[in-house]
Regions:
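Sec-dependent bacterial lipoprotein signal peptides
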Residues: 1-19
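Mature, soluble, non-transmembrane domains
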Residues: 20-23, 92, 99-101, 107-180
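An acidic-aromatic
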Residues: 65-115
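Bacterial Sec signal peptide processing site at the extreme N-terminus
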Residues: 13-34
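Post-signal-peptide N-terminal segment of Sec-exported extracytoplasmic proteins
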Residues: 34-74, 78
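Short, surface-exposed charged micro-motifs
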Residues: 56-58, 78-80, 150-153, 174
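Charge-rich amphipathic alpha-helical interaction elements
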Residues: 35-46, 87, 93, 171, ...
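Extended beta-sheet lipid-handling architectures
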Residues: 33-38, 52-54, 61, 83-85, ...
């Protein structure tokens, strides 16, 4: 799998949480819909070159059951992830791939597991309640540290969130949410 496809898969994984089986339709999904633009950069490591990709996204549902569409700037969907208790399904032009859970998906795509469940809360500007967090105090930019990541909320009033993990390979996730 080339690095763009792997990173597209990573983007799908980044915004999902829980274990999954594809829901039958978007109408079955509860929770809030988030949409906007997402950019992910994984710095180079001894095993792999630096990778980056950006996409428009629409996230429906919640950490337990939902769907994520990733689109080109012209609106063509190039990856879709669906999840519900039991299985994760990633659909790309290269085919469908099932995973037992999102940790398995992120390990397959990036070679390591990422804190997917936390990202639902991080995109809403708050720490995930499932793990301890530490607020970042002034004069630093507002935000918090959680699970080895620094979540920067300096531009949250502009609907922007940046999460960065410094541990190698460092990973940066930038999201610009559409306003309702």
């Amino acid at each position: 799998m080339n690095w763009r496809c792997r990173l597209a898969s990573f983007l799908a994984a980044v915004l999902m949480s829980g274990c999954a089986v594809a829901p039958r339709s978007a109408d079955e999904l509860g929770g809030e819909t988030l949409s906007g633009r997402l950019a992910v950069r994984v710095d180079a490591s001894a095993a792999a070159p630096a990778q980056s990709v950006s996409a428009a996204f629409e996230l429906r549902g919640d950490a337990g059951r939902g769907r994520l569409d990733l689109s080109t700037p012209l609106g063509s969907v190039f990856a879709q992830a669906r999840w519900a208790p039991g299985n994760v399904l990633l659909v790309t032009p290269q085919g469908d791939t099932r995973f037992d859970d999102l940790d398995a998906l992120t390990r397959a795509v990036l070679g390591e597991s990422l804190p997917i469940a936390a990202l639902f809360d991080w995109l809403r500007g708050r720490p995930w309640p499932g793990a301890p967090s530490t607020p970042i105090v002034a004069p630093a930019e507002p935000g918090f540290e959680q699970l080895g990541w620094v979540v920067n909320l300096a531009r949250f009033d502009e609907a922007q969130v940046v999460a960065r993990r410094e541990r190698a390979p460092s990973v940066t996730v930038r999201a610009k949410l559409d306003r309702p």
